[in-house]
């Protein structure tokens, strides 16, 4: 990868859920951790570079579940590391609610 390119992880959240800041942070952390574990298997050199350069992340929002699933589908089709978080339902939202998509690093 050229030195000017930065590896980035993108976290895409659902705006319609109106999660508390803490819940949203936890869901993003789940997505990030799963993406790192996947990247460790699929591209450990890029993951190492990503971590050494500060593990840059960008958080974006989509309006609803349909949009979240579209983002996830496109990331998978593009061959990117990605993970769709499904909540366990212990706190704010029902079990099985899909909350965040993590994409990258890449």
What are these regions (language model features)?
Residues 10-12, 53-63, 76-106:
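Short basic, glycine-rich beta-strand/loop surfaces that mediate nucleic-acid
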Residues 18, 48-51, 94:
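Generic, ordered loop/turn and secondary-structure boundary motif
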Residues 15, 43-47, 89:
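Glycine-rich, flexible loop/turn motifs
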Residues 29, 34-65:
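Compact, glycine-rich, soluble single-domain proteins
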Residues 26-29, 73-77:
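Short, solvent-exposed amphipathic alpha-helical segments in soluble enzyme
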Residues 66-73:
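Short amphipathic alpha-helices within nucleic acid-binding modules
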Residues 22-24, 71, 95:
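Short, well-ordered secondary-structure micro-motifs
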Residues 2-42:
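Glycine- and Gly-Pro-enriched alpha-helical subdomains that act as flexible
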């Amino acid at each position: 990868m050229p030195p000017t390119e930065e590896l980035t992880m993108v976290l895409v959240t659902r705006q319609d859920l109106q999660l508390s800041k803490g819940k949203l942070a936890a869901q993003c952390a789940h997505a990030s951790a799963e993406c790192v574990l996947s990247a460790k298997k699929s591209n450990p050199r890029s993951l190492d570079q990503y971590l050494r350069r500060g593990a840059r992340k960008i958080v974006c929002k989509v309006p609803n579940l349909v949009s979240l699933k579209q983002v996830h589908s496109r990331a998978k089709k593009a061959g990117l590391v990605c993970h769709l978080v499904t909540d366990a339902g212990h706190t704010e939202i029902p079990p099985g609610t899909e909350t965040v998509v993590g994409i990258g690093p890449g």
